Amino acid sequence: MTQESINQPIVVAALYKFVTLSDYVAFREPLLQAMVDNGIKGTLLIADEGINGTVSGSREGIDGLMAWLKSDPRLIDIDHKESYCDEQPFYRTKVKLKKEIVTLGVEGVDPNKSVGTYVEPKDWNDLITDPEVLLIDTRNDYEVSIGTFEGAIDPKTTSFREFPEYIKAHFDPAVHKKVAMFCTGGIRCEKASSYMLGEGFEEVYHLKGGILKYLEEVPEQESQWRGECFVFDNRVTVRHDLTEGDYDQCHACRTPISAEDRASEHYAPGVSCPHCWDSLSEKTRRSAIDRQKQIELAKARNQPHPIGRNYRLPSEA
């Protein structure tokens, strides 16, 4: 057991695997029961194409859930990344049925049949510093604004669904021979690599395990990462050492907010921030004020408040 895990007893596990789960509807109930039995909070998405999600629990609980998943031969090599925190980052336990575990919205894209070349974190720096490589961040604009890799292109998308149109409008397989992509945990860039191959791009690479695995394995002094990394739970962001970062998140617009944002006259905790204060409807503002009062009351009673934040997984973002 590491000192970090002793000081921060909650394990946060981001996991996914593209694999054919033709029985995913029937798989939901036993999976949910396994989460409950192991005291796991968080959300897992399942579809015919696989499983995806982020969950949290005790060391024993996470180990128990992973052992249960790996007892299914289809999931024996399921990928997951771990970090730690000192309190539960999720309030509920859910398993959702989906058409896609990460929504690209393009028919025929199947990572179970075709994906790009996985690149280990230790080899990533050599790849992305190659001047012939086009480096693309597949995440949303609000994620990129907090941190990204040196020299990465920001597509400025607000949803992963917009990624295909961005590629079609800006890049040509005949011109852009080498493409490298990355995302938070590896799932979006893996699916994007399948799409890119289908569009005729020949050399397509993606970061295995995503940014989180890179931050875990690559020493900060050697890192090409700049800033913090957005995560889809109550921590909002993590630093290079995977400890909780300096950002909060606006409850109204979900934009990550910095200390400077919180000092703004347009920031009202739980209600608005400099990014949305002038665009909220009066109905939304009143609802946010009422919700914030409930949150503060729950805190005063030392009780968790289940609607304190409304987080989405990358597949739903």
From Swiss-Prot:
Entry annotation: catalytic residues: 183 (cysteine persulfide intermediate)
PANTHER family: RHODANESE-LIKE DOMAIN-CONTAINING PROTEIN 7-RELATED, THIOSULFATE SULFURTRANSFERASE/RHODANESE-LIKE DOMAIN-CONTAINING PROTEIN 2
Record's keyword annotation contains Oxidoreductase: yes
SS bond partners: none
Job description of the protein: Catalyzes oxygen-dependent 5-hydroxyuridine (ho5U) modification at position 34 in tRNAs.
Disordered: annotated segments: 298-317
Class of enzymatic activity (EC top level): oxidoreductase
Family: Belongs to the TrhO family.
Protein name: tRNA uridine(34) hydroxylase
GO MF annotations, alphabetized: oxidoreductase activity, acting on paired donors, with incorporation or reduction of molecular oxygen
CDD domains registered for this protein in UniProt: RHOD_YceA
Keywords for the protein's UniProt record, in alphabetical order: Oxidoreductase, tRNA processing
Domain (Rhodanese) ranges: 129-223
Entry annotated with the keyword Transcription: no
Matches recorded under InterPro entries: Rhodanese-like_dom (IPR001763), Rhodanese-like_dom_sf (IPR036873), TrhO (IPR020936), TRHO_N (IPR040503)
Catalysis: reaction(s): uridine(34) in tRNA + AH2 + O2 = 5-hydroxyuridine(34) in tRNA + A + H2O
Coiled-coil intervals, chain numbering: none
GO biological process: tRNA modification
Underlying gene: trhO
UniProt xrefs under Gene3D superfamilies: 3.30.70.100, Rhodanese-like domain (3.40.250.10)
